């Protein structure tokens, strides 16, 4: 009987890559904030209600994206680990 070879390490690495991309969003967020501050006059000047609301909304949106991406990456990694554990259990039972 042939062996089935699953690449659980690749799945785990994919989950880690998703989580790393989520973490990298902070750099993008800060770059956008710098641009928003430079263009503050568009919203009525830095410190204006519209400017502050835009910054708050932007931060909230980035936080939501980060949380969802990080959570998805964790789920992918947990699924990989769970599948690998199940595979080892079944494999040892068949040995």
UniProtKB/Swiss-Prot annotation:
**Highest taxon in the source lineage:** Bacteria
A Pfam match: WXG100
Q: Where is this region: Disordered?
A: 72-95
The disulfide bonds in this chain are none
Q: Which family does it belong to?
A: Belongs to the WXG100 family.
Q: What is this protein called?
A: Putative ESAT-6-like protein X
């Amino acid at each position: 009987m042939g062996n089935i070879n699953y690449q659980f390490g690749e799945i785990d690495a994919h989950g880690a890559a998703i989580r790393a991309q989520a973490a990298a969003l902070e750099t993008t967020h800060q770059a956008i904030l710098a641009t928003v501050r430079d263009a503050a006059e568009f919203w009525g000047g830095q410190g204006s209600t519209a400017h502050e609301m835009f910054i708050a909304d932007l931060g909230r949106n980035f936080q939501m994206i980060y949380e969802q991406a990080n959570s998805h990456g964790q789920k992918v990694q947990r699924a990989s680990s769970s599948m690998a554990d199940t595979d080892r259990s079944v494999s040892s039972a068949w040995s």
